[in-house]
Amino acid sequence: MKGARLFVLLSSLWSGGIGLNNSKHSWTIPEDGNSQKTMPSASVPPNKIQSLQILPTTRVMSAEIATTPEARTSEDSLLKSTLPPSETSAPAEGVRNQTLTSTEKAEGVVKLQNLTLPTNASIKFNPGAESVVLSNSTLKFLQSFARKSNEQATSLNTVGGTGGIGGVGGTGGVGNRAPRETYLSRGDSSSSQRTDYQKSNFETTRGKNWCAYVHTRLSPTVILDNQVTYVPGGKGPCGWTGGSCPQRSQKISNPVYRMQHKIVTSLDWRCCPGYSGPKCQLRAQEQQSLIHTNQAESHTAVGRGVAEQQQQQGCGDPEVMQKMTDQVNYQAMKLTLLQKKIDNISLTVNDVRNTYSSLEGKVSEDKSREFQSLLKGLKSKSINVLIRDIVREQFKIFQNDMQETVAQLFKTVSSLSEDLESTRQIIQKVNESVVSIAAQQKFVLVQENRPTLTDIVELRNHIVNVRQEMTLTCEKPIKELEVKQTHLEGALEQEHSRSILYYESLNKTLSKLKEVHEQLLSTEQVSDQKNAPAAESVSNNVTEYMSTLHENIKKQSLMMLQMFEDLHIQESKINNLTVSLEMEKESLRGECEDMLSKCRNDFKFQLKDTEENLHVLNQTLAEVLFPMDNKMDKMSEQLNDLTYDMEILQPLLEQGASLRQTMTYEQPKEAIVIRKKIENLTSAVNSLNFIIKELTKRHNLLRNEVQGRDDALERRINEYALEMEDGLNKTMTIINNAIDFIQDNYALKETLSTIKDNSEIHHKCTSDMETILTFIPQFHRLNDSIQTLVNDNQRYNFVLQVAKTLAGIPRDEKLNQSNFQKMYQMFNETTSQVRKYQQNMSHLEEKLLLTTKISKNFETRLQDIESKVTQTLIPYYISVKKGSVVTNERDQALQLQVLNSRFKALEAKSIHLSINFFSLNKTLHEVLTMCHNASTSVSELNATIPKWIKHSLPDIQLLQKGLTEFVEPIIQIKTQAALSNLTCCIDRSLPGSLANVVKSQKQVKSLPKKINALKKPTVNLTTVLIGRTQRNTDNIIYPEEYSSCSRHPCQNGGTCINGRTSFTCACRHPFTGDNCTIKLVEENALAPDFSKGSYRYAPMVAFFASHTYGMTIPGPILFNNLDVNYGASYTPRTGKFRIPYLGVYVFKYTIESFSAHISGFLVVDGIDKLAFESENINSEIHCDRVLTGDALLELNYGQEVWLRLAKGTIPAKFPPVTTFSGYLLYRT
């Protein structure tokens, strides 16, 4: 018994300590890949067998499965114990034995990997090749796919029907699957299935949900080349008497076979990321997530309820309940199988114990001589060795079985524990959701009954703030409008007063006429009474007078009619004036808007120019003044030393004649020291002058080097852009994988169910779901109302203010609400931009103040130096005057002369330095004046431009294009200046950074090895290297000497590609390098299979340009009018199209000409690729003709394509006729 216990303990320790961490399972299948393995399911009787066809190559990984007689039993037991009930074929459902299609085959492979992978296992694929280690994340990822495949087996059966191997069931299954699963289940599908799928896709129109993917693959082909050699033949008899006979040679052709890889590409339309289904629609999960995120933004409590609603949506669905019950039954089946296995293990342990006890009994009973003789025979070495080997083999077999069983036990127990924890969490979430839903119902009822005070207060505050802002912003324009209104009212009052005066004068004249008429009548009556007898004589006079009166009255009536007409004319003029005023107001507003936009643009350009100029000034000051500062500090230190020495010497010189004899011996030493210091000062000043000269020289050299550096910078920027693009593509794939993984896990959480079936909870869930669904539209309405309130608040407040201000204005002069809104928007924009411009101007003023402060500091330093020099000179002169009586007067005089001369030289140099600083200040002031002049000239230009536009309205399009061409060289000059400053800064920072880099490289020598060890990919690196060499062949540094592929430089089967100045080799596995001579890996390593190909996203590259100007000089045709430029690869300034990707491009061009003879070329990198020509042979008469052409070229990254006119002219025409277009067909 003790031995049995030790045996069991050893086996358990072995399986627990080693089997869990280093258990390796290897499965193989015959290389045909078509052998079918029959596997009985858990719930099916033994006569019902389901056949699974396992493919050797899938989209995920190519895994060859090898079965050994030792592993088949364990594998069969695993498959029997772990097949879920969704894969079983029950006779009641009527499901037939059918072979899976291509999509189902891929799922079968994933299922096998999921069911048989341990927790931390390293699985060997492709025996004889490298072993691929799978991490926990990839295992979980595959497990999620296996669980999804179990769920979707039922959907495949329902959609596909009872289809067999054909493509009906496969397409149906693919239609209902996620995009990630369709990508995995592609595999090596049948041709019929693919053709059907493509036909259904390409018949429909392409929208934004579809993306083009290019399928590329390398196919090796054999090329036959005939190598011709000429062999001289024998000399025959010569028939000529004089001269030499010709030699005859024989032609021999030898066939030479070569391998060449051709790139085979095909275009395929697929759903973009985030879309799925046959019509590439948005996923349901993403739509729900969008809805829930919009709801969550409105209110936090509402968002929480919606999120919990999303988790509990499946509580009332019968399908979800059925899935949950199926999974519970499946877990119960697993538990029963585990119990059976534990019973079997206990039985085997009991059998071992019984055999051990029987052996002990036999040994105790049989103590005879025969048994002892047998024991003596058994004590020989050979028998002992045999017994040991047998025991070891049996022990190993038993140990392996125990490891497998214990690993399975751990796996099942861990899965059960995970399921139990997940169900517990779900129950907790359900309870929390029920409680939160009840609380939310109360909260929603409270919210519906009463509006929140906080929102109302916020709205009031917001309205008050908006009113204040409106009053601040609209005071000036409203005052101006009021002034105009008062002016117009005064003009109208004047016109009314004039009309009133006119009417009064008319009334007065009419009254006077009536009075005159009455007087005449009275005089006539009196004359009739007095002169009755003389009536006959007067009657003739009266008739004449009456006729004249009638004529006068007619004339006056005509005058009155004319006056009324004049009044009507004046009224119509007043109306016309009001209408014209309104029109002028509208025109003035439009002009003001245009002028404001132009002023903004001009101000922006001026600010940019001033900023660039200030940057240049700051850099020049930093380059010139900072080293001068260091030199001046050194000068001040040396002068301080001089003053200190002179102070030490001063008491010695002031002493009496007793010390003069000793001083005579010490004076030469001190003079030598002073001379050395003065020499140092002169050398420092000379070095300063030399540094200034070198700075000027370097500045000139840098100006010359800027043009060369521009091209290098552009190339580097393009290379970095490509690398960033590749990195972004990789990160997008990683993000898509992560999103798919999260979505898969989210789907798994929905499929989990509780162990206990509580009917009351389900009824509550349904009722709560109905209540929540009733609340959702109300929440939507609330969100919409709040958004409309927030968005339209400013507009309504503005309308109210405008209505108040316009209440007293007459109806004729009221302005429209739209005009006020436009004015309000314009004033808001102008105020914000003015604030920005004020900030920028304040920054500029601060910088100018800093420069002035720096110059003042330098001036003060120079004055300090001059004062120090004078202080050092004064005591020395005084001491010399006191002690100039005694001997050695000549020596002292000589020394004084020397010192005076040197100090004078120092003074002259300091004066020279001050002059240099003065010249620097002059240059600074000149630069500032230049900036001001430039700004004034630009403002004058801006003022004159609208006048020119008014005068040249028919040619306004040509004028705009001319302006763009005028502005572009100025911008280029500015950019060149900025680039020159950049290069200066880089050159200055390089020597300091190189030393730091060398130090950091010494410290980080050990780091790259560790990083490379961590970053070992599971795939061969040669595939990546080959792809990079095919794409970015322009990144290689080309030599100056041109060498083509005519010499066949690529070795070891590599293919040669001609470039602009050199060639590149696309090497075969496992070689790399410039000539395919460097070997990467061992010979036993497998080559990458390029025949399967790969899918890549096809970028959008297309351009369309036209030519509107006239062209009379031969050269490159500059198409100035650019309509389409996807990819930003065509530059109108040069007329060249730069290739952004390696691939096949299509170009088309049309050229119009009136000349008798026109010709030109389509140029690729300076080489004439195609020619176009047209000539009128009969006569030199000019005629209108249009040339068209197209080309399909395979081009490399960095190459340039343009059109060159060799002979003839192109007329100016608008709309244009001469065009040039091109686009990327597909990448290679």
Swiss-Prot record:
Query: Where does the entry say this protein is expressed, by tissue?
Result: Synthesized by endothelial cells and megakaryocytes. Stored in platelet alpha granules and endothelial cell Weibel-Palade bodies, following activation of these cells, it is released and attached to megakaryocytes, platelets, endothelium and subendothelium of blood vessels. Not found in plasma. Found in vascular tissues such as placenta, lung, and liver.
Superkingdom is: Eukaryota
Q: What residue stretches are annotated with the C1q domain?
A: 1096-1228
Q: Where does the record say this protein resides?
A: Secreted
Q: Which residues form a coiled coil?
A: 333-365, 400-430, 503-523, 580-650, 675-726, 819-869
Q: What is the effect of changing residue 265 to A?
A: Does not significantly affect protein secretion
| BP GO terms, sorted | blood coagulation; cell adhesion; cell adhesion mediated by integrin; negative regulation of cell migration involved in sprouting angiogenesis; negative regulation of vascular endothelial growth factor receptor signaling pathway; negative regulation of wound healing; positive regulation of platelet aggregation
Q: Where is the signal peptide?
A: 1-19
GO MF terms held by the record: calcium ion binding
Record's GO cellular component terms: extracellular matrix; extracellular region; multimerin complex; platelet alpha granule; platelet alpha granule lumen
Mind listing the UniProt keywords for this protein, alphabetically? Coiled coil, Disulfide bond, EGF-like domain, Glycoprotein, Secreted, Signal
Query: Which residue range or ranges hold the EGF-like domain?
Result: 1041-1077
Q: How does it assemble?
A: Multimeric. Composed of varying sized, disulfide-linked multimers, the smallest of which is a homotrimer. Proteolysis of the promultimerin in the N-terminal region, leads to the mature p155 form that is stored in platelets. Interacts with factor V/Va.
- PANTHER family in alphabetical order: EMILIN ELASTIN MICROFIBRIL INTERFACE-LOCATED PROTEIN ELASTIN MICROFIBRIL INTERFACER, MULTIMERIN-1
What is the associated disease?
Answer: Deficiency in multimerin-1 due to proteolytic degradation within the platelet alpha granules is associated with an autosomal dominant bleeding disorder (factor V Quebec).
Primary role: Carrier protein for platelet (but not plasma) factor V/Va. Plays a role in the storage and stabilization of factor V in platelets. Upon release following platelet activation, may limit platelet and plasma factor Va-dependent thrombin generation. Ligand for integrin alpha-IIb/beta-3 and integrin alpha-V/beta-3 on activated platelets, and may function as an extracellular matrix or adhesive protein.
Q: What is this protein called?
A: Multimerin-1
The top of its lineage is: Eukaryota, Metazoa, Chordata, Craniata, Vertebrata
